[in-house]
Swiss-Prot record:
Its EC number is 7.4.2.8. Keywords: ATP-binding, Cell inner membrane, Cell membrane, Cytoplasm, Membrane, Metal-binding, Nucleotide-binding, Protein transport, Translocase, Translocation, Transport, Zinc. This is Protein translocase subunit SecA. It comes from Cereibacter sphaeroides (strain ATCC 17029 / ATH 2.4.9) (Rhodobacter sphaeroides). It is a peripheral membrane protein. May bind 1 zinc ion per subunit. ATP binds at Q90, G108, E109, G110, K111, T112, D503. Gene3D superfamilies: Helical scaffold and wing domains of SecA, P-loop containing nucleotide triphosphate hydrolases, SecA, preprotein cross-linking domain.
Length: 908
């Protein structure tokens, strides 16, 4: 008998069915327009794009109204550029992306082509579209591949990757459609907000982003902040000394919680630690672990414990070229250039005996959660999102729509086979692989870590089964290994296949085979080579299909069902046959930590012998519940982290917005004046309380403060003795005196130079104060959790204190800017000559060494107008007539180190 919910779904359809049905009429309109666009010439297609741009940018037509025509034009452009005609389901995926949804599309359904439709449509608005991928290889590949479609349509494509120059990045972001990784986009956003002028910024806004492998970027990596950091003091000796203590610990000294991936010292551990730290001299005599002065050493010891107990070689990291390389637990890729913060990376370096790099101090940071919420509109694609639909909606406001496949999925998903021990499981895996291999069926074996993939590889070698291994160590051969994984009888062992970005095609990858054949024989005719290889491939593909298609064998369940589904999804692409199965044991991490007791009872009930596997729906249900429990816990952690990060994010947006306003404003004298007046108000409040008499004022303290902050020698004692002088009079006189001082400075420097000095001081001070504030917030965040023991809500406490700290930072910012502007002065003639001599000495030294040298450091005081002549016998008399055309913002050819417009190009 059907349940009420099932009956209702049969009658009314699921919410997903209704969403799919709602766009069918749009797809029909696009199909109706197809003959009209097929009749256009190549130039006609480009002209259509120009017409669409006018209608949107000048005529005010909405992108929704334009969608059918734009999609029809894009479909025809792709057909001509790539020979690919988009299926109806691909058009549906494109519509859902444009509407700001996540389109769940199975592997092999052509997500890369799908992205071109919403990217093209939204690029017509002229604000730029970002297509986001998980690695640089995919960004470059997709930009080159789909760039042919955009070129056919008359649009420009850019690609952003590390180590490009500012000019290259700016050009890439200025393109209609820009391909980039999530990391590079986030880092460029942070770098832009550290620039000295708006002209130097690379990104031009955040209009629309299409995120490929959206679950990997917005969920798996959501907890990892992007951090731009600078070096701080070197403490490598301390890390080495602390590391020698950790192996002395026994189990009673610490408590390891594998569920939460946390480790803490017990009371016995603290006592042992204090004793050993005193003996080694790391803790001064008479000092306790609980003293405030011990905070630093306690932090280092805690990080050393985490490095030893939570981070394992070949699981969380590998050692290569005297470096610790982190491994992405979800994709198995090496994360080059990524380091753990708070001294944890240094603790791992000490543990492994590699060179210890200096700790870094945070200059700027942002999480992916908050970066991607900057976009006006966001869309995403993945093969697996339904299990995290609630999180996508709650955090990003993104709905998940399952797009129908072009052909029905023909993959057979078998129930899990559960063994009692890992040894029995491995025997079962090897036997299953051997059987499939002998039948010619290609096999993809999924493992969760490098050491497990290599252990399985050893077992297969012992059994005489040829195979390839794909993990972080074989990163360079990745494309070739994946391309061969669908060949007849191929056996491929891979750490997590999530986000690999390359389809496993039955019979192998035709394009890769063609490239290899042409590389081996450059004289061969490309068309003949392709025809021969396509014929061979078709024959091999049929034999692979007869053998059952790709067999995906999982050796362990992941904490997330989504990662398991991604592994399964590698098989059965585009209606191909396939099969998937997971081989598990009660000794697997997930089973041991989360589901072992319950499953043990189930297995005992079902009855089980040595070497025998239990395959039963009960087991699957039990496992799914364990995974759902872990997913719910991880979601709660991410939600809580986001609440804390939102506090910093609001402050970050305020600071970055203020910074941008300063860069865009030509004349900042009014902002500087407002700051100065506020500082005067603060000084009066501090030394001359409201409703007080003159004889109650702290005249001496006020005089020192006015000299320090405003650079004024004001006769405060004399003013205090005058009849009728009150706080308002003192304030007015100080404001007038400070205004006169700044007017005189502006006259001495010249208005343009003074404006430049104000801008430079404001930006430098904001950056310095923001860096200090980030460090303070990090420290607050690390201790605020303890407030829970006092029955106080840590989040509320964090919000209150973070706001107070932000206000304090703004007050300090005003004081520093005012003080620096008061102290800046024109250089004397002697100082100018000394600066020029120093500059020329460095220039000569650089020429002698035949190597570039950094410009001479500029003194704290700024050079005035007019600019002095060069002095000294070697200087010679500059001849401006010989310089040709010099841009006004370029360095002056005379070698003064100043801009041409402030030197020989000055307009008198």
């Amino acid at each position: 008998m059907l349940g009420l919910g099932t009956l209702a779904r049969k009658i009314f359809g699921t919410p997903n069915d209704r969403k799919v049905k709602s766009v069918r009429s749009l797809v029909a309109r696009i199909n109706d327009l197809e003959p009209e666009f097929q009749a256009l010439s190549d130039e006609g297609i480009k002209q259509k794009t120009a017409e669409f741009q006018r209608r949107v940018q000048e005529g005010g037509e909405s992108l929704d109204d334009l969608l059918p025509e734009a999609f029809a034009n894009c479909r025809e452009g792709a057909r001509r550029a790539l020979g690919l005609r988009a299926f109806d389901v691909q058009l549906m995926g494109g519509i859902f992306l444009h509407q700001g949804n996540i389109a769940e599309m199975k592997t092999g359904e052509g997500k890369t082509l799908v992205a071109t439709f919403p990217a093209y449509l939204n690029a017509l608005a002229g604000k730029g579209v970002h297509v986001v991928t998980v690695n640089d290889y995919l960004a470059k590949r997709d930009a080159e591949w789909m760039g042919k479609v955009y070129a056919q349509l008359g649009l420009a494509t850019g690609v952003v990757y590390p180590f490009q120059s500012d000019e290259e990045k700016k050009a890439a972001y200025a393109a209609d459609i820009t391909y980039a990784t999530n990391n590079e986009l986030g880092f460029d956003y942070l770098r832009d907000n550290m620039k000295a002028s708006k002209e130097e910024m690379r990104q031009r806004g955040h209009f629309f982003a299409i995120v490929d492998e959206v679950d990997s970027i917005l969920i798996d990596e959501a907890r990892t902040p992007l951090i731009i950091s600078g070096p701080s003091q070197d403490r490598s000796d301390l890390y080495t000394k602390v590391d020698k203590l950790i192996p002395e610990l026994v189990e009673e000294h610490y408590k390891l919680d594998e569920k939460t991936r946390n480790v803490t010292f017990t009371e016995e551990g603290n006592e042992f630690l204090e004793k050993r730290l005193l003996e080694t001299g790391l803790l001064p005599e008479g000092q306790s672990l609980y003293d405030p002065e011990s905070t630093t050493i306690v932090h280092h010891v805690n990080q050393g414990l985490r490095a030893h107990k939570l981070f394992n070689r070949d699981q969380q990291y590998i050692v290569r070229d005297d470096e610790i390389m982190l491994i992405d637990e979800f994709t198995g890729r090496m994360m080059r250039g990524r380091r753990l913060s708070d001294g944890l990376h240094q603790a791992i370096e000490a543990k492994e005996g590699v060179s210890i790099q200096p700790e870094n101090v945070t200059l700027a940071s942002v999480t992916f959660q908050n970066y991607f919420r900057l976009y006006e509109k966001l869309g995403g694609m993945t093969g697996t999102a339904a299990t995290e639909a609630e999180e996508f909606m709650e955090i990003y406001g993104l709905g998940v729509v399952e797009v129908p496949t072009n052909r029905p999925v023909a993959r057979a998903d078998e129930h899990d086979a559960v063994y009692r021990t890992a040894r029995e499981k491995h025997d079962g895996i090897v036997a299953s692989i051997k059987d499939a291999h002998e039948r010619g069926q290609p096999i993809l074996v999924g493992t969760t870590s490098i050491d497990k993939s290599e252990a399985l590889s050893d077992l297969l070698k012992a059994a005489g089964i040829p195979h390839n291994v794909l993990n972080a160590r074989q990163h360079e051969q990745e494309a070739q290994i994946v391309a061969d994984a669908g060949k007849l009888g191929a056996v491929t062992i891979a750490t997590n296949m999530a986000g690999r970005g390359t389809d496993i095609q039955l019979g192998g990858n035709v394009e890769m085979k063609v490239m290899q054949a042409l590389a081996a024989d450059p004289t061969a005719h490309p068309d003949e080579v392709r025809a021969r290889i396509e014929a061979e491939h078709a024959e091999e593909k049929e034999r692979v299909k007869e053998a059952g298609g790709l067999f995906v064998l999982g050796t362990e369940r992941h904490e997330s069902r989504r990662i398991d589904n991604q592994l399964r999804g590698r098989s059965g692409r585009q209606g191909d046959p396939g099969r998937s199965a997971f081989f598990l044991s009660l000794e697997d991490d997930l089973m041991r930590i989360f589901g072992s007791d319950r499953l043990d009872k189930v297995l005992s009930t079902l009855g089980m012998k040595e070497g025998e596997a239990i395959v039963h729906p009960w087991v699957n249900k039990s496992l799914e519940k364990a995974q759902a429990k872990v997913e719910a816990r991880n979601f709660d952690i991410r939600k809580q982290l986001l609440k804390f990060d939102d506090v910093m994010n609001d402050q970050r947006k305020a600071i970055f917005s203020q910074r941008l306003e300063i860069m865009e404003t030509e004349d900042l004298s009014e902002i500087a004046q407002d700051m100065r007046y506020q500082v005067i108000d603060d000084l009066i409040d501090q030394h001359m309380p409201p409703r007080s008499y003159a004889d109650q004022w702290d005249i001496e303290g006020m005089h020192r403060a006015v000299q320090d902050k405003l650079g004024l020698d004001a006769p405060l004692a004399k003013w205090a003795q005058e009849e009728g002088v009150d706080l308002d009079v003192v304030r007015e006189r100080l404001c007038e005196a400070s205004d006169r001082q700044m007017t005189e400075k502006a006259e001495a420097f010249g208005p343009e130079t003074m404006r430049s000095i104000e801008k430079q001081i404001l930006l430098q001070t904001i950056d310095a104060k923001w860096r200090e504030h980030l460090l303070t917030l990090e420290h607050l965040r690390s201790v605020v959790g303890f407030r829970g023991y006092a029955q106080r809500d840590p989040l509320s406490e964090y919000k209150t204190e973070a706001f107070a700290l932000f206000e304090s930072m703004l007050n300090s910012l005003r004081q520093d800017v005012t003080q620096k502007l008061a102290q800046v002065r024109p250089l004397s003639e002697e100082e100018q000559q000394a600066m020029m001599r120093q500059f020329l000495d460095q220039q000569r030294a650089a020429a002698a060494a035949e190597a570039p040298v950094a410009p001479a450091p500029q003194p704290a005081a700024a050079a005035p107008q007019p600019t002095p002549e060069l002095v000294g016998a070697e200087a010679g008399e500059p001849d401006p007539a010989a310089w040709g055309n010099v841009a006004r913002n370029d360095p002056c050819p005379c070698g003064s180190g100043l801009k041409y417009k402030h030197c020989h190009g000055r307009l008198d």
